[in-house]
């Protein structure tokens, strides 16, 4: 074993020890994973916290059963007591705990009928207020208690952001462990089957592993945690490294079979590195373009991906070649996979006209889907519709809403928010909001005051409203009024739970409708906050970054294609070919109404990066040979090998039980196949004026023949 290989193995072992001991590999997903504290979108949240006493970290448990039976109410009492004993739970509000005390009282209560009684009268809610910093620890304990109390007559279901966040984190962690490992093994299996060399297999696996490890070490050193998007970064970096290695190895193999070549490794590096460098540069700048987005997960992905693209090329050309030196020269026999690749390529090449037509027709058919993109999906879309989790979340959502929205209002005429006139307007606004189709429940100042009057009828009716509010601000009353009115009495707060199940409009459009309702009732909507609007803003940023990012990427690829090719026609053909990939992927998302969530949204960018890799290698080869057919004969195998390995590796993500992972894997699978076929056929066709004219002419002839036969 050469000394260089021994040093690489030792470095790999040390890197594994370091990442195991010092780098947290659990995805960090908390209730603030949408934005960082300095993002403009969170400034409204900070302002609301300054104005009001908030208890925003809530968990909602729905208990379905015969809600009027004593046995049901006894169970509610028992589970409420068990939950209240958990460390990290601030309060428990239920039918029997810090609530109305009985079903009749709840139904007659202005507050409790809105807060804990479901719309279908088949369940009641248990509202848990959590300590935010302990919410991730509390959720598993709450689930344990739910399991111990649940039976066929007492069905317990949960909702609320802390619960959803914990489930997303679990799914990401499971997929990180299972599917990334499976992808790693599948990549290795195919590399060995294609090249039939243990040295190449070992070099590929060690190089790709080091690329992932070193990227995570560097990102950890600059305080970028593994988050909701960077959880799949390991597979992306593995693929970027693997792509460089596949092209390098095929070139090395071609030079080794050339009797005039003295040093196949150096010659292979000399031929492969320039296109690899340009491919890396496009990917690097593409990831950097995400830094302009004010959504923390996308910025983290941008930095991590940019670092990963640099590490990938360094590892591919500094680590892997040492293992090529260990490969013993011997007669090479084609593996079964290579025979399959040859047959596949021949079949594709024979029917290339149909392949080109199918790609263009598919792109045109899916084009209307771009106007139907579901770019603002609900949190329900993160879970399988047939699963118990989705069904539970959906039930709670339909019966009172599940996504919180805070409205801070002030009067148009400058009156105090609790004046007689304003108080009547607050009730009118309360009732108008409750009539909105997207609003599940509303709690506001008039509801709280009405509840106080009901509980102390004599004092409540006699006592002036300002004194009643002062009493409700006392610690003995849990300072409840401070959550709904400011000290200067100028601002009032409405706490809404929004319904996601039936939503057809983007969240921000619904918030705009609510703003108009607020103004029609005599108030200005000063601030809108909480998860509902944050998700709406995130969705807007994702689609904006997707469109802007893709436009910048394609422009960037065009510039680099011109630098590499020195031809405007080839540059234009690259731009058109690259455009086909995201248009088809996103068009399919729209046509089939597949939710474009924050996890699956970057998939088209990743697929484009892979497509440009093959195209740049082909452009460099064309400058050398000046013949596209010779270029295909030389590069079809590394292009298709890369396509097969990557497509199968990401294809296993379709077997995940976590829909965002399925969508991410499926999008890259489709994009990888499109990228390879456009690189092999569409780009060369568009760049050759004569061939394009001949192809269009032959297509017209065939269309005329078909038209003649049909008549």
Q: For each of these PLM feature ranges, what is it?
A:
Residues 83-89, 295, 399, 430-437, ...:
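Acidic-histidine catalytic/liganding microenvironments
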Residues 28-87, 421-423:
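Juxtamembrane extramembrane loops of integral membrane proteins
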